[in-house]
A protein has these predicted regions:
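Bacterial N-terminal signal peptides
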Residues: 2-13
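Short N-terminal micro-motifs specific to bacterial/archaeal maturation
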Residues: 6, 108, 191-194
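Secreted/luminal cysteine- and crosslink-motif detector
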Residues: 12, 16, 55-58
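C-terminal/domain-edge helix-coil "capping" segments
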Residues: 15-46, 120-124, 136, 147-154, ...
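Extracellular loop and loop/strand-boundary signature of outer-membrane beta-barrel proteins
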Residues: 142-145
């Protein structure tokens, strides 16, 4: 019986080794206003199943299927997860749409990705812009306890200062859920997920929460003597 139970556990869903990597975490010199820029579908730009480089941080991801409306879902979740913070003031992504259209028309689409973010933030009087790219957002095929194809999600996120275009902070999430037998070191997430195969939405929201754990806090002014 013990051998049987061990075999069952090892076949239950775990995840890949790499979920979140903390990198380039700076103490920001932003004041308060941060524009949430809509997530961009990079598979629509580069195609599926190719190695693509992030135009902001340079990290390479394998693209894949991106479910319909995944970009809007992640953009909305990013806003929800940050909106209650007292140290920042968010500008919703919806306010950027008209500005982006005008900038692309004015510059005949020759702006770099970073310049587009900076100019949009400047037009909306933001101190920083928080943007992200989606490389994969593949839904699971199957149910909670048995799948033909597991969920797979990859995205990155960046905080850029408007005044000089400097990248202040960035982080990323990259996971394809695997059976625990393929990675016994992922027992923690395996237990948190109640030994089941999760959806792409669940994976993405969980990954976004993990990524935001390293999100920097704006500098506070020195107290007057």
């Amino acid at each position: 019986i013990k051998i049987f139970l061990l075999t069952v556990i090892l076949c239950l869903p775990g995840c890949t080794k790499n979920i979140v990597v903390k990198e380039n975490v700076f103490s920001t010199s932003c004041k308060e206003k941060i524009l949430i820029f809509p997530f961009k579908n990079m598979a629509a730009v580069y195609g599926e199943n190719v190695n693509s480089r992030c135009p902001i941080c340079g990290k390479v991801f394998m693209t894949g299927e991106v479910a319909e409306d995944a970009d809007n879902m992640l953009t909305e979740q990013l806003f929800i997860l940050l909106k209650d913070r007292k140290d920042i003031q968010l500008i919703p992504a919806s306010q950027s749409q008209g500005v982006v259209s005008d900038l692309l028309s004015e510059h005949q689409k020759r702006l770099s990705e970073r310049d587009l973010l900076v100019e949009t933030g400047r037009a909306l009087k933001a101190d920083c812009v928080l943007s992200g790219n989606i490389f994969r957002f593949r839904e699971r095929v199957g149910g909670k306890y048995s799948v033909d194809l597991p969920a797979s999600v990859a995205f990155d996120i960046h905080l850029i200062r408007v005044s000089d275009g400097r990248l202040l902070w960035n982080d990323h999430f990259d996971e394809t859920q695997r059976p625990l037998s393929e990675n016994l070191f992922r027992l923690g997430p395996f237990l948190q997920r109640k030994a089941r195969w999760i959806t792409a939405n669940e994976m993405a929201v969980s990954g976004l929460k993990d990524v935001l754990k390293s999100f920097p806090v704006p500098n506070k002014p020195e107290p007057k003597q």
